[in-house]
């Protein structure tokens, strides 16, 4: 029953991690297309007066953020999506067949969960911090009358499609951090499963030793009686 509970919990969390990974990857891919491969994470710029008489301002990008940042978080989202899908199918198969991982495979699963947990945390942090820097830059640290969300409805004249950037990264961050919570739960379950399997193995070894001791005493007594009769 305990094994079935572990497998059922893992199956549900893997499915949720797959779902949230999908939620993160789709808007990130759309943003990459809208910005023509340019990355708005960590992008900095300033507002300048384009027309002094009319007082019209235009946002000038001083330096676009590193493309590797956007590529990394998209890659992590895809990896999380694929791994969770494979693991969900594998766990569901074990649940239906009544199989269970060995102690060694449970330990490998724990290491994999820890690795993915760390990588998704890094991706979520990059997404949150990088997008915060972009919003601070485009709103001049809150000095602009419009918020970062409102500015997506304004044509920033950057040669890119910026009509959905806030919604895209808000959804992507939600997907990444939700996926991280799922992997956190999976890591805890993987640790508990390793501990459970280790305790079971110790119990099995203890039972084997007790059986050997119980079988060994009668054999020793029979050998003693046989030797005594032979001497007589």
UniProtKB/Swiss-Prot annotation:
GO terms for cellular component: membrane. InterPro entries: TMEM179. The chain crosses the membrane at residues 6-26, 75-95, 114-134, 169-189. It is a multi-pass membrane protein. Keywords: Glycoprotein, Membrane, Transmembrane, Transmembrane helix. Glycans are attached at residues 51, 162. It is found in: Membrane. Belongs to the TMEM179 family. This is Transmembrane protein 179. The lineage of its organism: Eukaryota, Metazoa, Chordata, Craniata, Vertebrata.
